[in-house]
Amino acid sequence: MDGCRARRRARQAIANEQEPIVLEIIDVDFNNPEHGRQVLAMLNEYASGPMGGNTPLPEYAQRNLIPELAKRPTARALLARVDGEAAGVAIYIEGFSTFACRPLVNLHDLGVSPRFQGQGVGKHLLAALEDRARRLGCCKITLEVLEGNAVAQGLYRKQGYEGYALDEHTGRALFWQKKLAV
């Protein structure tokens, strides 16, 4: 990620029941140790929760994730911070739509710290992601969401996301995987 983009910051106020907080959304520089530490902490918190499998990231991922993301020019992230403290993260990867012949962005991970949930952090991360995708000339943003994650599905719907289907006869797309031995 170039330095100019990494220095761009979007500041937004969020209403909290106690007092307004100032949310800062930054483009992550995976070569910045503080950014890397905060992204890893957010992902570990997400992985340790019910929608992440209730297990921290494996030791291998904790040691290697940030350097591996830094090697990949299409891997990017946004970090939401409140007073310098990580409040949320969105990791996204640029892909390509063959049918539209244009780039797309896949939101790979979206996590908000439990301390900041319900305060608009996810909404602001999604808005910032949409802004970045538009700047890249993307035709769409894709994501996967667990069937049982009603809160995330509600957030995505409110932001204009919907299940993917070509038409009613072929049905909705399913997200499949095949794990490969390493």
Whereabouts are the PLM-identified features?
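Conserved N-terminal entry element of GNAT/NAT acetyltransferase domains
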Residues: 4-8, 13-37, 41, 48, ...
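Conserved acetyl-CoA-binding loop-helix of GNAT-fold acetyltransferases
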Residues: 112, 118-131, 154, 158
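C-terminal "cap" of GNAT-fold acetyltransferases
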Residues: 24, 30, 42, 137-182
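Conserved acetyl-CoA binding element of GNAT-fold acetyltransferases
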Residues: 102-114
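Conserved beta-hairpin
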Residues: 75-90, 113
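A conserved beta-strand-loop-helix scaffold within acyl/acetyltransferase catalytic domains
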Residues: 82, 92-99
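A short helix-loop-beta-strand connector motif used in the catalytic cores of GNAT acetyltransferases and
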Residues: 67-79, 106
